[in-house]
Regions:
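Beta-propeller blade termini and top-face loops
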Residues: 1-169
Length: 169
């Protein structure tokens, strides 16, 4: 891919609004309280380091973008979720991946789950109750009834991969 596209006429026409070197966009969420506030999970290029990897935020409807979470030039963001009961709270999952001739590195020690309580200004890596070591792709969800219940579907080693639930984040 070549970035984020936006339509203001119900999909009749589209305009590229940035993140052209992200190549792989995993998710886009729009703040329900302010539709100009957009979060984009960018995985980055598969075949090389760099590109626009990380979690990006636009406060002006896509006119400008700021990277608000970045781990490394080989690790992108595979998911981002916003607490529907408190839009200040975000969770994001990181995914370290690279394709080389004949192999795909689909996970590594930089994979994990991060939490922000200030709309992405600061982040804390969550570790309690989660697997360590090489982590692959992670899918996230927050319970709409109980915001402190967070679900994660984690690809990892055979003994640690699986469906995780926390009731205290």
């Amino acid at each position: 891919g070549d970035g984020i596209y936006k339509s203001i006429d119900a999909g009749n026409s589209w305009k590229n609004v940035g993140l052209k070197t992200s190549e792989h966009i995993a998710k886009i969420i729009i703040d329900p309280e302010n539709t100009d506030n957009i979060y984009v999970a960018a995985q980055g290029p598969l075949w090389r380091s760099g590109g626009q990897r990380g979690l990006y935020n636009s406060n002006d409807g896509g006119k400008s973008w700021n990277r608000i979470l970045h781990v490394s030039d080989d690790t992108g963001i595979s998911d981002v979720v916003m607490d529907q009961n408190d839009n200040d709270i975000l969770y994001a999952s990181t995914y370290q991946r690279r394709r080389h001739f004949g192999i795909l590195v689909a996970g590594g020690p930089e994979g994990g789950i991060y939490k922000s309580v200030d709309r992405g200004q600061t982040w804390k890596k969550l570790k309690a109750g989660l697997p360590g070591g090489d982590i692959g792709r992670i899918g996230l969800a927050i319970s709409p009834q109980k915001s402190n219940v967070v679900y994660a579907l984690i690809t990892a080693k055979e003994e640690t991969k699986g469906f995780y639930r926390s009731g205290d984040y």
